[in-house]
Amino acid sequence: MVVELKNIEKIYENGFHALKGVNLELKKGDILGVIGYSGAGKSTLIRLINCLERPSSGEVLVNGVNLLNLKPKELQKARQKIGMIFQHFNLLSAKNVFENVAFALEIARWEKTKIQSRVHELLELVGLEDKMHFYPKQLSGGQKQRVAIARSLANCPNLLLCDEATSALDSKTTHSILTLLSGIQKKLDLSVVFITHEIEVVKELCNQMCVISSGEIVERGSVEEIFANPKHAVTKELLGIKNEHGDQKSQDVYRIVFLGEHLDEPIISNLIKRFKIDVSIISGNIEELTTKDIGYLVVRFLGSVAETQRALEYLNALGLQVEKLKD
């Protein structure tokens, strides 16, 4: 495991209980989206991973080492393998792009000749070689975040922490930054933790996700699993799943989940042909995830109890997830 959080509690001096019994693992090469509403504990959680904050109790293991047991110099060295980017970029306004990236290497005591080549390599990676002499005030928000990404990768980390890294950007720039991060993750084989309140970020970038609410992880799994079968009420809210059958009685109203391999199949048509029922489609949509697409239909079955049951068994036999909706 690249990251292991074990039995984490975080209580501030004012008595606020920010994190409660948090256990979390991140495997090598995974991109984990941590999503929740404001005040849920997301930023506290990510700052614990590199010990910018320390827990009240529990263990923080990164690359197999408990960071809480390290001396200050040992912790500083361990942090070099953990890159981090923030919502507001945190660039030094008096330094140009080249100098901002080089600064991380100077702190780590790289040789000057190696700093030159490394910075050029990083700026090429993020597409900013032609901006190396620009100052932050001359850059757009997306360009500033690209500088921050280059700086975070300076010391060749294997773990990248992103704290609301796209929240200050417009949707087009957000997409370009997520595309960049996805490419960098694959090229460098990084493990990534991405804190966000935007479900679109999780859909576009992540293969794993967890949902945090009031300091607790309420749901954890692959993005595909959670989108297909969300269990917690907060997860359903974040995914935009509401009372999709409106004012209709919930009797015989179901939500059917279609995974990628079933999206192009005429399943509803086959259902009507096979069984003595009609199917009324109430709503439907398709979510495009980074791993595979997932389709949803909310339908009402019009027919006898026996035929409806046979239709449900048929859908289950196909491997589809079917949930009866409640009022």
Regions found by a protein language model. Name each.
Residues 67-83, 112, 226-230:
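ABC ATPase NBD coupling module
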Residues 134-137, 155:
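Conserved signature/switch motifs of ABC ATPase nucleotide-binding domains
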Residues 220-221, 229:
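ABC ATPase "signature
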Residues 65-66, 102, 106, 113-130:
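Conserved ABC ATPase "signature" region
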Residues 95-102:
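Short coil-to-helix segment of the ABC ATPase nucleotide-binding domain corresponding to the Q-loop/switch region
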Residues 50:
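Helix-to-loop junction immediately C-terminal to a conserved catalytic motif
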